[in-house]
Regions:
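N-terminal loops that bind phosphate or other acidic moieties
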Residues: 1-147
Length: 147
């Protein structure tokens, strides 16, 4: 039997791939001969880059950008070279997981770093952009990234 698992992440506890691997282990307990393929899945927030880059044979990039509280963060994004497309998660540069519970205040956060990721992708030849906007710690309507 051939089975594909594609499970979204469980915020704060498991990545998409960890959840898929857990399901695969459970399937193998019942049927040791099953062929289980684990694929990442995301809804536009955390895990979107991993899912799309994996499925579209892209490459991962890392760039230091301004985080949601104006501190430096390393943001990972993807490039699909065949279409010059960048795959970006707002969560990577301005995500809620980058802000402690005590510091969560949308009046103090920015999407500026998302714009820096876009600039890096442009510098690497990208002309198309897929931007997942889930998992954000911001409420600036994207004004920060336009700066």
């Amino acid at each position: 039997m051939k089975i594909v698992t594609a499970i979204d992440s469980f915020k704060g506890s498991m990545t998409s791939m960890e959840a898929g691997q857990a399901a695969a282990e459970g399937i193998h307990r019942v049927d040791a001969d099953a062929e289980v393929i684990v694929r990442p899945l995301a809804d536009g927030g955390e895990g979107t880059v991993e899912a799309l880059v994996s499925g579209m044979n892209g490459t991962l990039q890392k760039v230091q950008v301004t985080g949601p509280l104006s501190e430096p963060v390393i943001c990972e994004y993807g490039i699909i070279e065949s279409t010059k497309t960048a795959v970006i998660e707002m969560a990577g540069a301005a995500g809620i997981t980058l802000v402690s519970d005590e510091e969560r205040n949308p009046l103090n956060t920015t999407t500026y770093g998302v714009g820096e990721v876009i600039r890096d992708a442009i510098d690497k030849g990208c002309r198309r952009f897929l931007v997942g906007i889930g998992g954000s710690a911001t409420n600036d309507g994207g004004v920060g990234m336009l700066q």
